Amino acid sequence: MPPVLHVARRSDWEAAEASGTYPVPGGAPFIHCCLPDQLAGVLERFFAGADDLLQLTIDPRGLPLVVEAAEDGAGDFPHLHGPLPVASVVDVRPL
């Protein structure tokens, strides 16, 4: 699998760096991820007008990632079923 992306709020990422893991958001069954060609659509649908966002590039090797269909029919997306180890994030960029 190619690298996958996750859009994170800066404050959430800073907390993850301090603890060593980025947790599954409260109440969610997984961490939502996307492939590079899906990023623009994710930003438009879920983060329009948001600021202080970061693009996390994740090395998927060894992670419990499952590609699943989006509930809204927007396509198949990688979902991380479990917390994200900070060490698996290979690049962080502001959006």
Residue map of PLM features:
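Conserved, structured core segments of small domains
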Residues: M1-L95
